[in-house]
Amino acid sequence: MHDASALSNLEEILQIAARIGKVWRQKRAELTFDEKSIGQFASNADLEIEHYVRGALAQAFPGQAIIGEEMGGALSDDQTGWAIDPIDGTSNFILGLPIWAISIGYVVRGDSVLGALSVPDLDLTLSAKTGSGLRLNGVPVQAIPPPAAVKVIALGENDFEPGLRTDEIAQGLRAQNYAVVRYRCAVFSLAMSALGRLSGYVENGCGLWDIAAAGIICQEAGMDVTSNMIAPGRYAIDARWPAETSA
């Protein structure tokens, strides 16, 4: 699971998943979707991508537990297995915005150890495993932190954290001299952070599939990442570049 071929396999799986997503982007009129909760959607594109990724993972890594945002499942008893987000930012995807991403991460006892994500409309694939450093489109790269003077942080919102509480978090970040942006896509925001295009990302109440890949990717890029379960199936994450992390 932790050899070099695992990342290559994930990158290949993501390339095909991204192509599926791009095909759906070209036929948006055929998209159908349901609102799972306020502001949270699942489309037929989500389901097709997750179905493909599950099958590809089962073939490449047989016998491993799999959990996905749309099709459910469970990790093993010791919280080990794959976590899939077929389309993070589904509302953006439905609207035709380029801010959406696909994520596949492997966790061991709840900790992210290996993962890859794709931002298809930007032709970006990021991947990492513990101790390996960051890979961009399959090539090892050295991440460049953002300028310390340009403090822009992304904030996530979801159906778990009340809007007023999220606004309070935003106010706290502004008090630390951050400009706060909200892209409604955790995986995209964490990818941009890992590439040094944001100072970081904060969200309370995201799913494991949102951070299973991006968590280890941000760590291997050189960021400080803290995450913990705050309710069953819900996580808090704070990922920032070291110079930007408050004490």
Model-derived segments and spans:
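N-terminal subdomain of lithium-sensitive/metallo-dependent phosphomonoesterases centered on the IMPase/IPPase/PAP
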Residues: 1-87
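Residue-level signal for inorganic ion chemistry
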Residues: 20-24, 46, 57, 90, ...
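An extended, acidic
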Residues: 145-247
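Structural motif
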Residues: 64-65, 81-82, 114, 152, ...
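Generic detector of well-ordered alpha-helical packing
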Residues: 47, 70, 86-89, 120, ...
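A structural micro-motif at secondary-structure boundaries
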Residues: 136-143
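DPxDG-like acidic metal-binding loop motif
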Residues: 76-135
